[in-house]
């Protein structure tokens, strides 16, 4: 995924096709969110439930509110168990905390054995985590922390608070006792 190589290929086609057709002034725009930003974000979530029925479910405290892509169209995001990254594996579904049947981060995924309280890292969430997030079922979007090349971190977006849930409503005074 060499962006310079891709750009050169686009430029060649532009000059071979658009310029001779009298369209050399046309501007081309692209959205590079996944390409540029996805690798630079992670979602950290805690395992809150483990249920074994006909399959094993890991319930986590995050949900599609925090990362919509897997629920919306089954997008794959690698998941690491930070408490047991190299342990024996088991096949699990990693499910969010919403009451919707598509609130899943992984289906039939082989992961190192996981226990309640373990922290999972869902990788490559930097592009469309917060921007695709939404307020639903009293779930609020999580904070965003920037992890710099030097290892330092800083808060770049605070977690939503309950008052944010109603911030755009008019005609109600939620501050009254």
Region locations from a protein language model:
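Charged (often Lys/Glu-rich) extended helix/loop segments that serve as interaction or gating elements
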Residues: 23-177
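Acidic, glycine-rich loop-and-beta core segments that form the ion-binding/anion-interacting portion
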Residues: 1-28
